[in-house]
């Protein structure tokens, strides 16, 4: 007897290409001839295309391309236009925001101006794509849950690169474009403002981050575990609970004492995921504007007694 395992997609059934629901009045059509890719089918739908971009999609990609082009060319210029050095030092290359002396004004190109232009293009690209998700959802008769979830991530992005620098009075507070440079910015941000771990909104954000990962793993594992009973057909299980849903519910009642429903688990996951960047954005926005030192704030409000841990290693160990 074959063992039933479905951690990876092992069976792929290819029917006729799905061209999507009929489109109403539009100046743009779906582009591309559908093709099937076996390796894409390992993780998702094997069909690639056709795709609909429309005006908003094309404009978003254009602004995104300009942002990446500006960032990339500035990084390439910083290594004297050497492709080999660009690849070797790629993780260390950066495009920094203007220094504090320029405040909120437009800085010279080589002193932060390129960062401002790239930031504008990237923000325009993201916002245009966000509007596109709303319009595509409406056109397909869907709810706008994805749009609002995407908006939560955009909120955090705008806090880091625009809202907080605006409140602080200069763009030097913003995050640079670069892999290691933005990690260094994160470390310095926490150090300069007294350890971000004492920020209650950071605590809430991390709780929702870990909670999202836990819920995602629990839900995915549960559905895979009952897919032999048709558990992956969740819409059917929501409106007409079958043996897959009953077995999953019984498992969690036995192991946790409580079970979500086939519908409510998605609400749990949506709220946990959305509240992570929302809480994080609030915490970042309060840092430096309302609270200058989170460690001292934590002492004042009883989060810590202010006594540092003794990390001294004794000269003689027992």
Where are these regions (language model features)?
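Juxtamembrane/interface segments at transmembrane-helix termini
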Residues: 69-77, 131-144, 162-175, 213-234, ...
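N-terminal juxtamembrane cytosolic/stromal segments of multi-pass membrane proteins
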Residues: 1-59, 75, 79-100, 249-253, ...
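Final/C-terminal transmembrane alpha-helix of multipass membrane proteins
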Residues: 263-291
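Alpha-helical transmembrane segments and their helix-start/interface "positive-inside/aromatic belt" motifs
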Residues: 38-63, 135-156, 203, 263-274
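Alpha-helical transmembrane segments with an aromatic anchor "belt"
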Residues: 108-117, 121-163, 176
């Amino acid at each position: 007897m074959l063992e039933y395992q479905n951690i990876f997609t092992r069976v792929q059934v290819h029917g006729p290409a799905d061209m999507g629901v009929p489109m109403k009045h539009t100046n743009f059509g779906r582009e591309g001839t559908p093709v099937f890719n076996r390796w894409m089918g390992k993780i998702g739908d094997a069909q690639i295309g056709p795709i609909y971009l429309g005006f908003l999609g094309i404009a978003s990609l254009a602004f995104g391309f300009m942002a990446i082009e500006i960032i990339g060319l500035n990084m390439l210029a910083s290594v004297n236009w050497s492709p080999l050095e660009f690849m070797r030092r790629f993780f260390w290359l950066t495009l920094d925001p203007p220094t504090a002396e320029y405040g909120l004004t437009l800085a010279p190109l080589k002193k932060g101006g390129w960062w401002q232009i790239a930031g504008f293009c990237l923000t325009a690209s993201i916002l245009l794509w966000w509007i596109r998700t709303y319009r595509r959802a409406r056109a397909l008769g869907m709810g706008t849950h994805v749009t609002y979830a995407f908006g939560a991530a955009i909120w955090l992005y705008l806090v880091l690169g625009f809202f907080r620098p605006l409140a602080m009075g200069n763009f030097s507070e913003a995050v640079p474009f670069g892999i290691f440079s933005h990690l260094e910015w994160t470390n310095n941000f926490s150090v300069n403002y007294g350890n971000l771990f004492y920020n209650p909104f950071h605590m809430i954000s991390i709780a929702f981050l870990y909670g999202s990962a836990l819920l995602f793993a629990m839900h995915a594992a549960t559905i895979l575990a009952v897919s032999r009973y048709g558990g992956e057909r969740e819409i059917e299980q929501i409106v007409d609970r079958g043996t897959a849903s009953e077995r999953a519910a019984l498992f969690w009642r036995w192991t946790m004492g409580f079970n979500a429903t086939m519908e409510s688990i998605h609400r749990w996951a949506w709220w946990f995921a959305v509240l992570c960047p929302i809480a994080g954005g609030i915490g970042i926005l309060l840092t430096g504007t309302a609270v200058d030192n989170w460690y001292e704030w934590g002492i004042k409000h009883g989060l810590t007694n202010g006594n540092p841990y003794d990390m001294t290693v004794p000269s003689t160990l027992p």
